[in-house]
Amino acid sequence: MLRFKELYQQKIIENLQKKFSYKNKHEIPQIKKIVINMGVGEATADSKVINNAVNDLTLISGQKPVVTLARKSIATFKLRENMKIGCKVTLRKDRMYDFLERLVIVALPRVKEFRGFSYKSFDGKGNFTFGLKEQIVFPEINYDKIDTIRGMDITIVTSAKTDQESKFLLSGFNLPFYN
């Protein structure tokens, strides 16, 4: 069932070892966690909108998300401190590999005009962040039952020390990159 976990253990570790020649097996980069964040700006006007976002993120990730609160009040956005403004979920271990597999095999091919990810999305420490504009690219979301199309930010946190190691690791999982 967890093909990506087996792929990492059987092929990707071996390829990383050949390319970067690590002295210790604990130096080999791995994916630590995947964080999915969904900001809901409309929640300032209607507090029920956040529940729909939580339901969508639960279906996508298979895990109940945490509702995020505003840290401080901002009058121009009509935002008060401790107001619900989004939700996030952190995936680790088997759920992380399951989500990554569904993302690469099912969701990304359904994104319109998707050419791949830019290498500029790495943060310099081996972590990779990108955004999706629609939650409907995941088959778990029923288009007829959603109230509005929402995007999400996805961060893949790795133990890689450099972006080059992280790029090689994520390319092993068939994440499409360009340039």
From Swiss-Prot:
PROSITE patterns: RIBOSOMAL_L5. Pfam families: Ribosomal_L5 (PF00281), Ribosomal_L5_C (PF00673). One of its GO terms (biological process) is translation. It comes from the Bacteria. The keyword Signal does not apply. One of its GO terms (molecular function) is rRNA binding. Keywords: Ribonucleoprotein, Ribosomal protein, RNA-binding, rRNA-binding, tRNA-binding. GO terms for cellular component: ribonucleoprotein complex; ribosome. Belongs to the universal ribosomal protein uL5 family. Part of the 50S ribosomal subunit; part of the 5S rRNA/L5/L18/L25 subcomplex. Contacts the 5S rRNA and the P site tRNA. Forms a bridge to the 30S subunit in the 70S ribosome. This is one of the proteins that bind and probably mediate the attachment of the 5S RNA into the large ribosomal subunit, where it forms part of the central protuberance. In the 70S ribosome it contacts protein S13 of the 30S subunit (bridge B1b), connecting the 2 subunits; this bridge is implicated in subunit movement. Contacts the P site tRNA; the 5S rRNA and some of its associated proteins might help stabilize positioning of ribosome-bound tRNAs. This is Large ribosomal subunit protein uL5. It comes from Rickettsia africae (strain ESF-5).
